[in-house]
C-alpha cells in the first residue's frame, strides 16, 4: 500500500553522446526489497521502441538484491549494457546509473535529431508480509512494461543539443512539453549549467557534468 512520496517516488534523467545513452534514476523508498529479480521487487525495467512507437525493440531489467548482488536481465536484446546500483539506507534512496551503448539498442551511433521510444518502470516492493515483489511502480512511461510490453505506452525521447561549449540561454519558446504524447524538446547548446538557477527541479550530477532532470515523479 502506497503511503506517500517517502514510501516510493522516483526522478529520472537522460543524457547522451554519440556512443551511448545514459539514464540516471534516484528512487526514494522506505524499504528495499529484492530477492534477486530484474523485475519482481525493487527494480527498474527498461522498454525501448522505434520512433513510430509501434514496435518494442529491446527490453532490459535491472535490480539490486538484498544480498547486494547486481541483477541484469537481457530480456530482449544483445546485452552489453552497464549498470551501477547503490542503496543508501540512511537516506532511504537507491541510485541507478545505466549506460546503453549504441550496439545494445541495435544502432551504430546516436545522433542529434534521433528519436527513440523509452519506457522506464520503477518497481516497488516492501518487506512487510505479503508486500514483496512487484506491488507498485512509478517512472516515465511505466505502463510500457507493466501491462505487457507496449510500444505505444513509451515516451518519445528526441536527442538534441550540441557538444559542450558556448552559452546556453533558455526561454519559454525554447522548451516544449506535450504531456499527452510525452514528447520533450529542448533547443540550445548543452554547455555549462553550473550558473543556472533551477527553480523546480534539481540537476542530476554524474561524472562531473550536470544534466537537467526532465522528469520528476
Question: Which stretches of residues belong to each language-model region?
Answer:
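Structural preference for beta-rich elements and adjacent junctions enriched in aromatics
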Residues: 1-215
Amino acid at each position: 500500500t502506497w503511503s506517500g512520496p517517502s514510501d516510493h517516488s522516483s526522478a529520472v534523467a537522460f543524457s547522451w553522446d554519440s556512443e551511448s545513452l545514459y539514464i540516471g534514476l534516484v528512487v526514494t523508498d522506505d524499504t528495499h526489497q529484492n530477492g534477486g529479480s530484474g523485475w519482481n521487487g525493487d527494480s527498474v525495467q527498461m522498454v525501448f521502441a522505434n520512433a513510430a512507437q509501434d514496435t518494442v525493440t529491446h527490453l532490459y531489467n535491472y535490480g539490486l538484491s538484498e544480498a547486494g548482488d547486481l541483477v541484469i536481465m537481457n530480456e530482449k536484446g544483445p546485452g552489453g549494457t552497464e549498470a551501477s546500483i547503490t542503496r543508501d539506507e540512511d537516506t532511504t534512496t537507491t541510485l541507478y546509473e545505466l549506460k546503453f551503448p549504441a550496439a545494445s539498442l541495435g544502432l551504430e551511433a546516436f545522433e542529434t535529431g534521433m528519436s527513440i521510444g523509452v519506457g522506464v518502470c520503477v518497481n516497488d516492493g516492501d518487506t512487510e508480509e505479503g508486500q514483496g515483489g512487484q506491488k507498485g511502480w512509478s517512472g516515465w512511461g511505466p505502463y510500457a512494461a507493466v501491462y505487457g510490453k507496449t510500444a505505444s505506452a513509451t515516451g518519445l525521447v528526441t536527442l538534441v543539443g550540441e557538444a559542450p561549449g558556448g552559452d546556453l540561454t533558455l526561454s519559454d519558446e525554447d522548451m516544449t512539453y506535450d504531456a499527452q504524447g510525452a514528447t520533450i524538446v529542448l533547443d540550445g547548446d548543452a554547455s555549462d549549467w553550473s550558473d543556472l538557477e533551477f527553480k523546480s527541479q534539481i540537476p542530476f550530477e554524474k561524472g562531473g557534468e550536470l544534466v537537467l532532470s526532465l522528469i520528476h515523479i
